[in-house]
Amino acid sequence: EPRMIWYGTGGRYPEAPHIYKKDGWYYLLISEGGTEFGHMETIARSRYIDGPYKEAPHNPILAHYKAATQDNPIQGVGHADLVQAHDGSWWLVCLAFRVNHGLVHLLGRETFVAPVRWDKNAWPVVNGNGEIALKMDVPTLPLQPFEAEPARNEFDQPLGPKWSWLRKPVTERYQVADGKLRMYGSAEGLNELQNSPSFVGFRQEDFNFQAETCVELGKAG
């Protein structure tokens, strides 16, 4: 039977709850404030999983909506998870977006990580001050190198997970062969709400970049 165990701290749209058990406490971590500039993380704890829960005195434990952090290039921080690494260190993984020229953001929500320590009262503190930055001076975990994607795509193999479609693609409209990506047109446009138009692309990852491609039009133009 569903049971309400915590209403949050009063921020709108409380969501994304996670419960962790640590040292006899059940910690309930949630997101509040919506997914734009008011996004934040709050936490409460209880000795029993079904409560009652008492919120942390320094909530929100992660937020960038305050006046002191409005110039931070990372905004909309939230939707977080706490992770303990193999060496015993604690980290917070969250979603946020990078801004350019104040309020402009077009890269979508990206994944960020920040160190966490537990204070003398057994509450988590994110990066020492409840904020994250593009560069943080922290001990790093061992590097796990991965093969970087080539800057140029020769269409000599099937499209990988980097490529995106709108809604569920009609796979028959796309063909990768002979060093080319062949796309067949469709009646659906980009504003189609139900079906998928003939479109494929990949997400913009930087504010400034250059991209080139060679296009050959078929008989239909």
Language model: regions and residue ranges:
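Carbohydrate-active catalytic/glycan-binding domains of CAZyme proteins
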Residues: E1-G221
